[in-house]
C-alpha cells in the first residue's frame, strides 16, 4: 500500500544543563567558579534518500526526538553536543507545518538536507555569571528546550510518465506487462486506489519510471472521488499517456472520455495541459475497437499521436514504449510554479509579526495564568533548586513588565500565578 501523506511529531534535543561548581584544588586560593556549559541538543534533520519511494516507514514510527546535550561538568568542562537525528525521506517529499499549513521545504534532490527542528543551546555554567560584585555565583541555566512541531509529509511521485484515464480502461494491465510492477487488476472502478510505480526498459536500453495513477472521474479537480489524490501524483510527471478503452466496453464514447479527462487536467492546473500527451488506444483485440478507433482519429486529427495497443495481448506495446522514450528525451521538466534564475542571488526577508513575550488570562478559580514562548523558555531554563537562580528569574520577569501587568489586572498579595504546570504566589512588595 502506498502512503502519500502522513502526520508526524518532531522535537529537537534539549540543551544540556549548565553546572554550578568551584575549584577546590590544593594550593589554589580563591579558586572561583568552575562550572561548565551544557552541550547543544541535536537537530532533527530530513535527508533525501533516492532509494526510498514511499512514506511507508512513517506509518510505524511517527515520533522523532533528537538526543539532548550532555550536562556541563566541573573544572569548566563543557558538555558534549548531541548528534543530530537523521530522518531519511524519499525524493519529492513536501514538508508542511501541520499547525499553520506553511510549506517548509520541498525536497527533491538526493542528499538534500533540511533542519526541521533545531536542538536547544546548552545552559550556561556558573563561570559565565561571575562579576566583580558577585565573583562566586551559584547560578546555572538549564538547557534550552529543543524546537517541537507537528509536521505533515506529502509525497508527490517523481515518475517520468503518468498513465491517466477512466477507471478500468487497462492502465494497470499496461503497467504490469511493460515493467515488473504487479498492480491489483480487476474490472471495476477505483481498483487502483494508490499509485503503482514501475521501471520500464525499452529494447534499446532506455529506461524510465511509469506511474499507474488512481482512476480519474469527471469532477476530480473539485475533489470528487479520488480526484485530488490522483492529481497530486501527476503534477510532476513529464509525459502523460492517456489510456482509452477503444472497445467502449462500459458503453462510454472513447472521444468523450478523451475530452472529459483533458478538461479535468485543464481545470486543476493549467500547466498540466502543457505536457506532451500520447493516446494509448487500448483493447484493440475486442469487437468494435477498429471502427471506434477510426472515428476517434477523425475527431482528434493530428492534435495528439495515437497508438493502437492491446495490453492483454501486448499488441503494439513495443511501438508505444519507443514513442514514450523518444518524447522523454526532448521533454524538459514542468515546474508548477515559475522558478527563479539560479544565477540571481536574492535574499528574501519575510515579515513575521512579533509575538508578545507573555500573555495574562484569568482562570475560573481566580488564578492568573501566564503564557508565551519567551516566558516559558525562561522558566524551563531556570534551576529552581538554587536561590540565586530563583532571584534571577524574578528579576527577569520584572524587567519584562510581568509584575506591572499583573498589578494592572488586579493581582494582590497572595494571589495564585500559574505558569505551565507550576503555581507561584504573587508578592507585591518583593525585595530583590
From Swiss-Prot:
| Major subcellular site | cytoplasm
| Sorted UniProt keywords | Cytoplasm, GTP-binding, Hydrolase, Magnesium, Metal-binding, Nucleotide-binding
Q: Does the keyword tRNA processing apply?
A: no
Which PROSITE patterns does the record associate with it?
Answer: G_OBG, GTP1_OBG, OBG, OCT
* Domain of life of the native organism: Bacteria
Name the Enzyme Commission number(s) assigned to this protein. Answer: 3.6.5.-
Residue span, Obg domain: 1-158
Q: Which GO MF terms does the UniProt record name?
A: GTP binding; GTPase activity; magnesium ion binding
All copies of the OCT domain together span 350-428
What are its cofactors?
Mg(2+)
Q: Does the keyword Nucleotide-binding apply?
A: yes
Which residue ranges does the record assign to the OBG-type G domain? 159-329
| Residues bound to Mg(2+) | 172, 192
Cellular-component GO terms for this entry: cytoplasm
The entry marks the following residues as binding GTP, namely 165-172, 190-194, 212-215, 282-285, 310-312
So what family is this one in? Belongs to the TRAFAC class OBG-HflX-like GTPase superfamily. OBG GTPase family.
Return the protein name. GTPase Obg
Origin organism of this chain?
Geobacillus kaustophilus (strain HTA426)
What is the taxonomic lineage of the source species?
Bacteria, Bacillati, Bacillota, Bacilli, Bacillales
